[in-house]
């Protein structure tokens, strides 16, 4: 399976990744909602599907020459406006912070992508007041971010770094099953949240797959 270009990721590649995010959230909406019916209010998949449909429409509205950073910030604001529940502000913040980190770059090299991912994770953590181990999106995102950066710092290209990051994200997602929820609606379940996959961790994994794989 092919991955991101080994050198740079321009706005065309970013648009393609975001359109994949719409397709993958549509495809898995029912499964995400089933997960959320156990730990949340049973609408996570539907909300994300609506949000990324709105992102798809945004991509048709924005000029093709829109820089990646501006594009990501616009996506973040659209997600905040259209995704219900806690996930809209969380994912929206992640995209907005990544966009700010991108600055006015016309193309995103692997080192810049690593910095953008870290900014996204830090922003999400601040907005959600969550840490790794709280049974949230961050349990998937932070291991992926750390693994991507470590791979790039060791000299790997983006393709290999993304492959490693997706593997780390999958492991992080699965790590939420035995955890007790410490944030969100699942917090009210206490020990009863053990044994269930966190829906936000699952959707984060899917979005990282969309970014990494055509």
Q: Residues of each region from the PLM?
A:
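N-terminal loops that bind phosphate or other acidic moieties
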Residues: 1-214
């Amino acid at each position: 399976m092919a991955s991101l270009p080994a050198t740079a990721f321009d706005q065309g590649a970013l648009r393609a990744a975001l359109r994949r995010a719409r397709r993958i959230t549509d495809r898995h909406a029912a499964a995400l909602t089933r997960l959320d019916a156990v730990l949340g209010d049973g609408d996570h998949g539907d909300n994300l599907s609506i949000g990324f449909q709105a992102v798809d429409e945004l991509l048709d509205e924005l000029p093709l020459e829109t820089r990646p950073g501006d594009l990501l910030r616009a996506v973040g604001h659209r997600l905040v406006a259209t995704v219900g529940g806690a996930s809209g502000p969380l994912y929206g913040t992640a995209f907005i912070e990544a966009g700010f980190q991108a600055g006015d770059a016309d193309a995103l090299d692997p080192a810049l992508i690593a910095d953008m991912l870290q900014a996204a994770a830090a922003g999400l953590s601040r907005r959600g007041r969550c840490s790794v181990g709280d049974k949230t999106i961050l349990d998937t995102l932070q291991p992926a971010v750390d693994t991507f950066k470590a791979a790039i710092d060791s000299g790997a290209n983006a393709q290999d770094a993304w492959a490693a990051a997706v593997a780390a994200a999958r492991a992080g997602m699965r790590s939420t099953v035995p955890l007790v929820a410490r944030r969100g609606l699942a917090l009210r379940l206490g020990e009863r949240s053990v044994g269930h996959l966190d829906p936000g961790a699952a959707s984060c994994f899917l979005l990282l797959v969309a970014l990494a794989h055509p």
